């Protein structure tokens, strides 16, 4: 299998509770390597650009407000089938439906405050990674 990269965000609800290390432990247990990571405060413009696919949805404003409400940790993860592995490690968007041991089952507060974002495809991952990282920041 080919090694691929995916993009992750540890969201404000998790960073506010100092869960970065705990989330990273789940990521590493899933067999993924963290090859880039930084803690940032997402601007309104960054959040609107990042979530532009949801612009017409009724929750868009709340999503942007939430993602800019506190620090986030943006990451590049690497491994075999990284996109699928990380999505499995995150669990279902609704934490009540997430499998035991997943990030969202363990740490999410609600569907909206679900602690983590992960890319949905390798192509999306490449776009998302480029929004937050330059090539020399990714150390594989």
Swiss-Prot record:
The keyword Coiled coil does not apply. SUPFAM superfamilies: Nucleoside diphosphate kinase, NDK. Keywords: ATP-binding, Cytoplasm, Kinase, Magnesium, Metal-binding, Nucleotide metabolism, Nucleotide-binding, Phosphoprotein, Transferase. InterPro entries: NDK-like_dom (IPR034907), NDK-like_dom_sf (IPR036850), Nucleoside_diP_kinase (IPR001564), Nucleoside_diP_kinase_AS (IPR023005). It catalyses: a 2'-deoxyribonucleoside 5'-diphosphate + ATP = a 2'-deoxyribonucleoside 5'-triphosphate + ADP; a ribonucleoside 5'-diphosphate + ATP = a ribonucleoside 5'-triphosphate + ADP. The keyword Iron-sulfur does not apply. GO terms for molecular function: ATP binding; metal ion binding; nucleoside diphosphate kinase activity. CDD domains: NDPk_I. It is found in: Cytoplasm. It is an enzyme of class 2 (transferase). Its EC number is 2.7.4.6. Homotetramer. This is Nucleoside diphosphate kinase. The gene is ndk.
